Amino acid sequence: EYKKYWIAVVAVLIIGFSILGYLGTDVYHQAPPVPTAYVSQDGQVLFTKDDILHGQSAWQSTGGQSVGTVLGHGAYQAPDWTADWLHKEVSVMLDIKSQEAFGVLYNQLGTAQQAAVKEVVKEEYLGSAVREDGTVVLSPERIAAMNATGRYFVELYGDNPDLTLTRDHFAMKDNTLPELQDRIDMARFFFWTTWMASTQRPGTDATYTNNWPHEPLLDHNPTPESVAWSVVSVIILLCGIGVVVWLWSFGKKDDEHALVPPTEDPISKITLTPSQRALGKYLFTILALFLFQLGMGGIIAHYTVEGQAFYGIPLAQYF
């Protein structure tokens, strides 16, 4: 009787996991590279792949995507560090280029001059490709912008009193990452995520992240493919729901039998087994866990209002 349903379930699982496996493999092969090193134009090594990977581990040790995120994964608290770094660094880069060319900051330029400076910066960011030896060369201006942005993040994850209010807004405690070297390498990891989000993927007209994040300073806009697949996926979802509803409503051969109410309460006939009776002793344990879960949920939600406290209780000093 249920054979055809089992066949349908197995077919859906096979097709679904086959697509998932193919796309997962494709994503793995197209993952952005981690350069062996970032170097200056005179060949000086700024930092290496090992520094980036150590910075990733250092960032993950603070909770990873729970407090701030990278590459747009999203978190309850704090901004996306990739998008935040990109905006800050490009802003500094535009000022540096503007001062070199015109002697004033970017926001003091006219429209035509701003467009010219922006185009120069865009070309440098998009063209920051990996060389055959696995390294990426950064210009002196890019290095200066990177270092200026990196100092902010090193101090943000430290205990700089000037950023105390910012940490409170982001639900970060002072000295989120106590070791200075860990903070420096973490900043390098953030830079790498920003590099992949602003560098053109070879053979395409978009960055490694399909022009994410939206950054007007670099004219980052969604690619036509991203828009098309977003629309197609919504259409497929709606059509699929419609087919399921139609089959359920009109595909059944027979109407369901009318339900007949029982003559007596069926629960009254149930006899508890010894194992069911033994569950009573765990009632208070379950209640305690439920209350603990409610409390933790309240604390986490309240971090949006008080980033380092809970109704005046300074939790950041203890946890």
Residue ranges and their predicted role:
Residues 2-15, 226-234, 271-291:
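Alpha-helical transmembrane segments and their helix-start/interface "positive-inside/aromatic belt" motifs
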